[in-house]
């Protein structure tokens, strides 16, 4: 069965290829076309590329605000990916009832640097902490009542 299927597909493929070669070679080619064709094709490609590049440049200028918004979304997606990678660490810290202040001390992050550019791990844990402390189960826990970061 497999041999029959393979041979049938091979025959069909060879016949289709043979028909394509016959159709492609029906037109006679002159010596002038043979010599001039690559040059003309090159110029047409360059001209069409220039027209295409001008159109895309105009479109890019019009869509620059959309591109900036997309870049911001991509950066947010990257940061969410990093936070997803660190989720087990966040869960461990939360199970140890660590506040964001405890995490900051464990990561040896000074407070003055957090105001300028917070660590992604620390800011991810703060977000994780806020979300999980809003759950009914943890709402009244003493470590969730601390709001000092």
From Swiss-Prot:
Keywords: Host cytoplasm, Host nucleus, Secreted, Signal, Virulence. Effector that acts as a broad suppressor of cell death to interrupt plant immunity. Inhibits cell death induced by cell death-inducing proteins, including the PAMP elicitor INF1 from P.infestans. It is found in: Secreted; Host cytoplasm; Host nucleus. This is Secreted RxLR effector protein 17. Belongs to the RxLR effector family. Induction: Expression is up-regulated at later stages of infection. GO terms for cellular component: extracellular region; host cell cytoplasm; host cell nucleus.
């Amino acid at each position: 069965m497999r041999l029959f299927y393979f041979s049938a597909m091979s025959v069909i493929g060879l016949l289709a290829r043979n028909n394509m070669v016959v159709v492609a070679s029906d037109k006679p080619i002159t010596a002038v076309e043979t010599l001039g064709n690559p040059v003309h094709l090159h110029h047409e490609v360059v001209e069409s590329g220039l027209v295409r590049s001008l159109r895309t440049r105009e479109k890019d200028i019009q869509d620059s605000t959309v591109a900036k918004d997309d870049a911001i979304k991509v950066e947010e997606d990257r940061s969410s990916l990093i936070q997803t990678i660190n989720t087990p660490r966040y869960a461990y810290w939360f199970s140890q009832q660590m506040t964001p202040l405890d995490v900051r001390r464990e990561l040896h992050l000074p407070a003055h640097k957090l105001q300028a550019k917070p660590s992604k791990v620390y800011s991810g844990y703060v977000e994780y902490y806020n979300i999980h402390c809003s759950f009914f189960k943890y709402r009244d826990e003493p470590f969730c009542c601390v709001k000092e970061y």
